[in-house]
Amino acid sequence: MPKRLDINTILVIGSGPIVIGQAAEFDYSGTQACQSLKEEGYKVILVNSNPATIMTDTATADKVYIEPLTLEFVSRIIRKERPDAILPTLGGQTGLNMAVELAKSGVLEECGVEILGTKLSAIEQAEDRDLFRTLMQDLNEPTPPSEIIHNLDEAYGFVNEIGYPVIVRPAFTLGGTGGGICHNEEELIEIVTSGLKHSPVTQCLLEKSIAGCKEIEYEVMRDSNDNAIVVCNMENIDPVGVHTGDSIVVAPSQTLSDREYQMLRNTSLRIIRALGIEGGCNVQLALDPYSFQYYVIEVNPRVSRSSALASKATGYPIAKLAAKIAVGLTLDEIVNPVTQKTYACFEPALDYVVSKIPRWPFDKFESANRTLGTQMKATGEVMSIGRNLEESLLKAVRSLELGIYHLELDHLKELDKETMKKRIIKADDERLFIVAEAIRQGVTKEEINEWCEMDFFFLQKVENIVNMEREVKANVGNMEVLQTAKEMGFSDHYIAAAWNKTEREIYDMRKENNMTPVFKMVDTCAAEFESATPYYYSTYADENESIVTDRKSVVVLGSGPIRIGQGVEFDYATVHSVWAIKEAGYEAIIINNNPETVSTDFSISDKLYFEPLTIEDVMHIIDLEKPEGVIVQFGGQTAINLAAKLEEHGVKILGTSLEDLDRAEDRDKFEAALTKLGIPQPVGKTATTVEQAVAIAEEIGYPVLVRPSYVLGGRAMEIVYRQEELLHYMKNAVKVHADHPVLIDRYMVGKEIEVDAISDGENVFIPGIMEHIERAGVHSGDSIGVYPPQSLSEKLKEQIIEHTIALGKGLNIVGLLNIQFVVFKDQVYVIEVNPRASRTVPFLSKITGVPMANVATKVILGQDLVEQGYGTGYHPEEKEVYVKAPVFSFAKLRSVDTTLGPEMKSTGEVMGKDLTLEKALYKGLVASGINIPTHGSVIITVADKDKEEAMEIAKRFHEIGYNLLATAGTAQSLAEQNIPVQVVNKIDSEEYNLLDIIRQGKAQFVINTLTKGKQPARDGFRIRRESVENGVACLTSLDTTRAILRVLESMTFSAHSMKEITQTKRHEVVHA
């Protein structure tokens, strides 16, 4: 059927900020969909709140709205733009929920807007647990025994009938939010209560646990002609019981017989047809390993995380084709963009194995509960491709960027059998490593299978790796063993350690013996047809399929998996850099390993290598391609960390030199550079012993900011206010010695300013200056940023501009630089300089219209700023106000403290823009998920040092009609200031207390700056966690609180009695 001509304008709904459960995969799918619809001649309008994406670039759609994804704002856009249709299936759970809300509100009917791709009835049938169960019964498809419940009593009824364990699945939620497995009554009460709270329709499905079954996924496509195909089927190495986003996944499935494969394939196709989905759909199934009994777990009637993985695993662009199907085209009319010869109705075939390993944030949150269950915890993932599972798995392990090069962790070697058993049964982020350790220690595959029901096939693969380790260690210098180890994916790093050599020696040894990998093409058809895609992976085989052209080329290193501190912003910069390289006439080559991102879409670069970002894997590509050089400044810390090793291999680093990168990163060299330039910085020193640290802190005065010199991105940073806190930090957070010194700086309680600039070594251009609402001490990624600055004097602005220009020139920066300043007592100090792209590049690029990554790349390639139409100086400020607000995923990470500090905790960001700061702040806060009611109650529990400041805040809340609640100490301070307050019991009281108020939803805000320690038992910690679990905005920074007050005050009319007004005026006259 040809495309529809009765519609002209389509509104695409994005997925909003990155949170756990919904990451960069929707930037990839949304970008593809918008381009796909524009190709077909439709006018595309996009609404999304996330400025860090390629999707929200003005070139992606005909009109781009960066606005909150709420009913209020999306309805306004629909009424203004009057689209013919909306496409919500590419915006993740957010997009689907928005479509349901828009339909129920009547705005779609009022404006005559049609839903494309998946009908509203299909969304509700797949997402509403009751309707889905009924549909499965109608199709005679088995589901686990289950019951829909709306309260705890109904849950008890089901458990009494079926017994424990049971799985709780809340309706219409993302990444299993609020769900879990209950083994007893205590867990049932906790998880069901949480699930009902998180479900927008207060509904959960309780089902008998089928944990232990194999978990299999089918990614399917269907068009309006009822053509339906399987794009990819995938198998979770972890059995049912661990969320698929937290499971290690392989494609294609490895342990299914043909009969099982066909049985589950037919079921998947039957379900997509019954739902009437036109586009992509993900079906999750459970298979009993000992019979042909299977169960349908759930269906995602949209493009999902798994579809991004399936697209990159097969090369078949699901989102692009789903968009074309949504406008009426059929699979037999659409040409497969990979082969450019076959049609999209051909099912992809794979002649390689793909592995996906999740990237968890536990390196950031050491106190987090690492146990994996039905609620997702990973922030991102890596993917790798190999000719066998062992190779694929080991390549994925070293892609994780945790400093791990093999399936072994030193700290696990000490574990005894009983501890290993417990951890393998329970499942956490290290389970596969523990399985390998257990096999090393002689535990049998039968025992491990009994503990965790992982399939024998996968256990055998792990055993093959362990056996090969023994071979390697027993045959030092043996080339045949080395060849076999390399074919199994062993790294030079591992072999070097086993053979007591350096990694470089192993690399040279292989080159001398012609032992180098070849590159194979990902072509969707197992080489059955010729392919036109430049998409490659390495393996140790015979024929190389990556043909080197005679064009000059440049390699860009990507930023690897999405994690806290290194998000989609770096992928944005990478993609823009690649486009600039192509514009400059070079061949652009990208190396990355994240299946969720736009950068790993094969249509972006001239060549895509899907490989780990280690020196070994990167050098294989450089040895083949022989590029002009490598750009490292767009891939975050991942790429910067490779610069020194690349230079050792004789590779040219393009842009800022390694020496100058080091000058910005090395403490002593940086201090010397600042002194030479006459730029002030906070007083600080380096300690290599605990005694030294104590002496330095005494000398420069508390509070001090302490951090290790060898970790970046705010990890293990803390502000300490007295000696006992410093000693606690030195003992628990770092291991200090001569090689690992600790940096101790005077902590200045001032205003933080962030600047991004582009330098060509001679000229320094500053697109924008941002002011942080939270004072210095809160990580810049967790602060609310405002552009243009609202409270900086012209004099201070000039100082900042002068310092930025001096640093750009003085540090010989070629490309981007990011500087953080603190304004303290009307003086500007430099806190740090990052000689690379920062997370604010997409935000400032969109606001100012300066394509920063593009301009910086052209500078790196030799075109100076003046040639590009920019010179030295500050870009004229925009008239509107723009706010960048952080978004957190605390609800997914139990036992993580929500207090803001120098260590970054946010997973994503949103933008609010308007004519005034108050309106922009309102949009930013609402988009980030903070509800802003104009009245209600606020709980205030603050540390003694904050009491004075909190009084002014409390007074302002009272003025706008809020009811104030506080525990005895704070309440007394408020009463002394004649501020009305209701006293509530502390949390250790047996009677109705502060936590009960939070649980019952009787407070709209909690202001809490108590006990900023990391002990979960502390009062402050428990109050903050309870707020998160119950969806109450918990404010741990008084600056953030003031920002919210500004918004509330702007929304509230003043209500003063006439007497108060006359008294005030009389007072002014008296003191005039």
Swiss-Prot record:
Region (Carbamoyl phosphate synthetic domain): 547-929
CDD domains with a match to the protein in the record: MGS_CPS_II
Gene Ontology CC: cytoplasm
GO MF entries: ATP binding; carbamoyl-phosphate synthase (ammonia) activity; carbamoyl-phosphate synthase (glutamine-hydrolyzing) activity; metal ion binding
Region Allosteric domain, annotated ranges: 930-1072
Needed cofactors: Mg(2+); Mn(2+)
Organism, as annotated: Bacillus cereus (strain ZK / E33L)
Residue sites binding Mg(2+) 4 per the record: E832, N834
PROSITE patterns: ATP_GRASP, CPSASE_1, CPSASE_2, MGS
Recorded family membership: Belongs to the CarB family.
Subunit structure and binding partners: Composed of two chains; the small (or glutamine) chain promotes the hydrolysis of glutamine to ammonia, which is used by the large (or ammonia) chain to synthesize carbamoyl phosphate. Tetramer of heterodimers (alpha,beta)4.
Protein name: Carbamoyl phosphate synthase large chain
Entries under SUPFAM superfamilies matching the protein: Carbamoyl phosphate synthetase, large subunit connection domain, Glutathione synthetase ATP-binding domain-like, Methylglyoxal synthase-like, PreATP-grasp domain
EC number(s) per entry: 6.3.4.16, 6.3.5.5
InterPro entries (alphabetical): ATP-grasp, ATP_grasp_subdomain_1, CarbamoylP_synth_lsu, CarbamoylP_synth_lsu_oligo, CarbamoylP_synth_lsu_oligo_sf, CbamoylP_synth_lsu-like_ATP-bd, CbamoylP_synth_lsu_CPSase_dom, MGS-like_dom
Pathway: Amino-acid biosynthesis; L-arginine biosynthesis; carbamoyl phosphate from bicarbonate: step 1/1; Pyrimidine metabolism; UMP biosynthesis via de novo pathway; (S)-dihydroorotate from bicarbonate: step 1/3
Chain ranges passing through the membrane: none
Domain ATP-grasp residue range list: 133-327, 671-861
UniProt function note: Large subunit of the glutamine-dependent carbamoyl phosphate synthetase (CPSase). CPSase catalyzes the formation of carbamoyl phosphate from the ammonia moiety of glutamine, carbonate, and phosphate donated by ATP, constituting the first step of 2 biosynthetic pathways, one leading to arginine and/or urea and the other to pyrimidine nucleotides.
Gene behind the chain: carB
